[in-house]
Design a protein with these regions (language model features):
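Extended beta-strand/beta-hairpin segments
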Residues: 1-52, 59-142
């Protein structure tokens, strides 16, 4: 399986702007710029897209873990926060914090915690950042 996305940029870093599109066209000419990345401008940015990808990936992995354990979720809601920091050699993503709230009829806390930890470790986006960014998880069974 292979998925693609493209980015187009015009101009310099601070005064330029660009657009991002995905193969599925869910994102089509979605605007991004220095302002959207560093100053709360209108549009998206790479870190926001990574957060969305990680939240989605982890949530699907958790659903698979719970379903495999015989306790399919009623609902899962995950937020991912990506931290971008300036380092000596440039900017780096240093941490990703996942917060998930789960309604899982029949699941006990210990089994849920194990499923969440396994999902965090097994999610392909988590694997991508392993060793490069601290990934933390707050998993709540509600």
């Amino acid at each position: 399986m292979e998925r693609t996305a493209s980015a187009v940029w015009h101009g310099g870093l601070k005064d330029g702007k660009g657009s991002i599109s995905t193969q599925s066209t869910t994102l089509k000419d979605t605007q991004y710029s220095f302002s959207t990345r560093f100053e709360n401008g209108v549009g998206t940015n790479p870190e926001e897209l990574i957060a969305a990808a990680h939240a989605g990936c982890f949530t699907m992995a958790l659903s698979a873990q719970l379903t495999g354990a015989g306790t399919p979720p009623e609902s899962l809601e995950t937020t991912a926060s990506v931290r971008l920091e300036k380092k000596d050699d440039g900017f780096a993503i240093t941490a990703i914090h996942l917060v998930t709230k789960a309604k899982v009829p029949g699941a006990d806390k210990a089994a849920f915690d194990k499923a969440a930890a396994d999902a965090k470790a097994g999610c392909p986006i988590s694997k991508l950042f392993k060793g490069n960014a601290e990934i933390t998880l707050d998993a709540q069974l509600i």
